[in-house]
Amino acid sequence: AFAGVLNDADIAAALEACKAADSFNHKAFFAKVGLTSKSADDVKKAFAIIDQDKSGFIEEDELKLFLQNFKADARALTDGETKTFLKAGDSDGDGKIGVDEFTALVKA
């Protein structure tokens, strides 16, 4: 899904680093997969992949399955991880993450 945007080896390393429940850290993950250093356009492409229902927002249920966008058999995030991730990205408090919020979160 991220072909041409991210490197497979980087994705594998990032997923390996957060395999254990409650070990997911969005900043570390974005850095490891190489998203932090990507152009705004590439970050928007990543957003479009994660926004599975194409609503223009990443909702809590999509965040829970965030890792599965990178590898189909990756684990779901725990409720705690999902809520922390949402809180970090949802700067306007509407309960979901828009593309500008996502870009800011990746680049933070």
Curated annotation (Swiss-Prot):
Domain EF-hand: 38-73, 77-108
Superkingdom per UniProt: Eukaryota
Keywords: Acetylation, Calcium, Metal-binding, Muscle protein, Repeat
PTM sites of type N-acetylalanine: A1
Binding positions for Ca(2+) 1 per the UniProt entry: D51, D53, S55, F57, E59, E62
A GO cellular component annotation in the UniProt record: cytoplasm
A GO molecular-function annotation: calcium ion binding
Chain residues that bind Ca(2+) 2: D90, D92, D94, K96, E101
Pfam families the UniProt entry points to: EF-hand_7
Signal peptide residue numbers: none
Family assignment from sequence similarity: Belongs to the parvalbumin family.
PANTHER family: PARVALBUMIN, PARVALBUMIN ALPHA
Function: In muscle, parvalbumin is thought to be involved in relaxation after contraction. It binds two calcium ions.
Other known facts: This parvalbumin has an isoelectric point of 4.25.
Protein name: Parvalbumin beta
Source organism: Cyprinus carpio (Common carp)
